[in-house]
Amino acid sequence: IAAADPRARSPYLRRAEIKRTLLVVIAGDRGLAGGYNSNVLKQAAAEEGEVLVLPIGKRSAEYFVHHEVPLFTQEVLLAADVSVGECFQLSRQITEGYRKGEYDAVKICYTRFDSMMTQTAATMEVLPLSIEPTEQQKAEARRSQILYKPSSEEVFSAIIPEYVAGIVYGAVCESCLLYTSPSPRD
């Protein structure tokens, strides 16, 4: 869309100075996973600047309440019980807050699956979107006759919350898979 309509403007593409970040932090619901919880919580705690945290998982919520970090919600979302529908509801709240300027960036801290022997605490940048069309995409866009009805801005506004929901749900599923799978020492 950004390549096809160079005049497209969207709050999801803006590159402003990042003053406040919303961190979605996914940890386990129990403390039985050794480094699983501590690694992702250390990763989140290393985030620089002002943060607002959306904790997913009981250990995530307990950690940030104990450290008096501002929370996006007081509701405790159990990682093992988060549904696709809840992720879509969360994504609408996340994107609405982003559009209103309550925070300038959205990131997810979760445990990434590298292999059965290696899992890594990771931070994924979700918003603002980093979309730099290649020269080939720009050339193809100039040749194309794509006309957006509704406007490209309205299309962005409709699909980005869906995109964010998919990213959040994928990170929750990946983290929960690792949390519940047998460790190499089992």
Where are these regions (language model features)?
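C-terminal beta-strand-loop-alpha-helix "lid" module of Rossmann-like NAD(P)-dependent dehydrogenases
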Residues: I1-S181, R185
